[in-house]
């Protein structure tokens, strides 16, 4: 548990420090669940936090599916959150692009859920066809569940031949599962960047736009202004959850086991 102004404090369990907070931002993978399995004790901790009047908001880096899919996944594990209590980096991408529309068409990659739509923006679900890549004016990478070297090479060659805006809805490098780590978009993008492709525009933790939206949502859920010093980000990853929270001025809580 990181006090921004008092150093680091180690606590045996999250429930031991609940009295320090009026609101908690909760990462999903590694905090609430690991793959299809729930983290032991988290249901009881969530229940105690709610009993203490703490406002809860799941803030997850996930672009392949929308926030409703995450809600349903958590519900099947016994964790109940309302639609408003979950913000995904995919949702952040949808909101940002609604207000900052690139000149279309926008090529969509890695979508596993409902259609990704932005009002008044022509979105095309790309296939492994280089001519489709070359016809769009910008790209949005949602996830890498089915990513392979063909997708990687097509994106590289298309951007290398004709640089265009690239938006990425998940800044994770890896995600924890029960017996493995899945490779996430930032890993693949790091290889493109090392080969000279321009930096993408990232949505999700550790970047501030998702925390801006989270603060607005916390105010809506709680019905009051909660100081940053009373809001904690609970995560298991230093370079997304903890870095993002500390940079934004929140307290950060690193879950280590």
Q: Where do the language-model regions lie?
A:
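HAD-like aspartate-dependent phosphatase fold
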Residues: 1-257
